[in-house]
Regions:
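C-terminal helix-rich "cap/oligomerization" subdomain common to oxidoreductases
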Residues: 2, 60, 68-71, 290-332
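Active-site loop of classical SDR/Rossmann-like NAD(P)-dependent oxidoreductases
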Residues: 16, 38-41, 273-287
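Beta-loop-alpha module in the N-terminal Rossmann-like domain of NAD(P)-dependent dehydrogenases
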Residues: 17, 50-111
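Contiguous beta-strand/loop segments that form the cofactor/metal-binding neighborhood of enzyme cores
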Residues: 172-251, 279, 283-297
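N-terminal Rossmann-like dinucleotide-binding module
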Residues: 1-49
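A contiguous active-site-proximal alpha/beta segment in oxidoreductase catalytic domains
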Residues: 99-158
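Mid-domain beta-loop-alpha active-site segment that forms a flexible
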Residues: 122-129, 153-187, 202, 211, ...
Length: 332
């Protein structure tokens, strides 16, 4: 079985989805049935460069025998588009965030369950080889007890007009921590900035998450600083890890503290760069979506996981608005 997939949205990131879906088609894993976009100019460009059907009307494809839809559109369109696809019996991959609020995210999970369809979300760092290597180290207890994690997801570029920094940037680290620590945070402490003067969309978010195990997760995200930051650090009781997520490097630091009564000695036995095979996470992600369609297996980046990240982001915004910490009661 080669699932037939329609792609909705060929904008900034949708172009990458188009390229990867054509690669998977060439590999014999799926068929790209067609492309949907509201821009005639974009559709004309797609027709010039790819042998694929195009339309501005999604309903044309939903009435056909396609198996799935890949939604890469602005976040404020995700709910209605995904709802339409799911209720028409199609499997859905949707870029993050799954929706712009937790209530809509939960409804999409419900629709997928009722229709017995795959709902997968573009939480791409679950497929990043560096993150998977770090997950392996944590699961093997190589790092000991996780004290805290911190990272940056930020860089100077044109800000999105559909979501702010929390749902565009920090949501990635929220999910990475969820994946690595396998627990819900109990508390969110967040500060945001509206430096560009957009009342509804924060340009900067600095978030601290406290977990029931005692671990702390910190992430900073936004459009303002020069450069491009995609990094992650995990500090454990036995060893620590640093990673450049873009380069997919993982460095293991053999550092820890020796206690003698009330004094501590910092032990540094050096560091080593671990072997990580560089692979494009988007291709790994979409390849897994195809496999989930074929087998019925629940995706690693499923709707429940994605809804959880939106809920935590909502709590972060609440914390920023109230200027105090906010409890997170949702159980995992």
């Amino acid at each position: 079985m080669k699932p037939k997939i329609a792609l909705v949205g060929v904008g900034r990131f949708g172009k990458n989805h188009l390229r990867v879906l054509k690669e998977l088609e060439k590999d014999g894993l799926c068929t790209l049935h067609g492309v949907v976009d509201k821009s005639n100019e974009i559709l004309e460009n797609v027709k010039k460069n790819y042998d694929v059907a195009t339309t501005s009307n999604l309903d044309e494809f939903l009435k056909s025998d396609i198996d799935a839809v890949d939604v890469v559109t602005p976040a404020n369109t995700h709910f209605e588009l995904c709802k339409k696809c799911l209720t028409n019996g199609k499997h859905v991959f949707v870029e993050k965030p799954i929706a712009t609020n937790y209530a809509e995210a939960r409804k999409l999970v419900q629709f997928a369950t009722e229709k017995d369809r795959i709902l997968m979300v573009g939480l791409i760092y679950r497929y990043n080889p560096a993150v998977k290597k770090i997950k392996e180290l944590i699961d093997l207890k190589k790092l000991g007890k996780i004290y805290y994690t911190f990272g940056h997801y930020m860089g100077f570029k044109e800000p999105r007009t559909d979501v702010g920094a929390l749902l565009n940037f920090t949501v990635h680290h929220i999910d990475i921590y969820d994946y690595l620590l396998e627990e819900m945070p109990k508390e969110a402490i967040c500060s945001v900035g509206y430096f560009l003067g957009r009342e509804n969309f924060e340009d900067l978010a600095v978030l601290v998450l406290r977990y029931r195990s005692g671990s702390v997760g910190i992430v900073e995200g936004g459009w303002l600083p020069p450069g491009n930051y995609r990094d992650l650090t995990i500090v454990g009781s036995k060893k620590s890890v640093t990673s450049d997520l873009s380069k997919q490097t993982v460095i293991l630091h053999d550092i820890y503290f020796e206690r003698n009564d009330d004094t501590f000695k910092a032990i540094d036995k050096g560091s080593s760069t671990l072997a990580v095979k560089f692979e494009g996470p988007l291709k790994l992600e979409l390849k897994d979506f195809v496999e989930c369609i074929k087998t019925g297996r629940k995706p690693v980046a499923n709707g429940e996981v994605a809804a959880r990240t939106v809920m935590i982001a909502e709590k972060a915004l609440e914390s920023a608005r109230l200027k105090r910490s906010v409890k997170i009661h949702e159980s995992k």
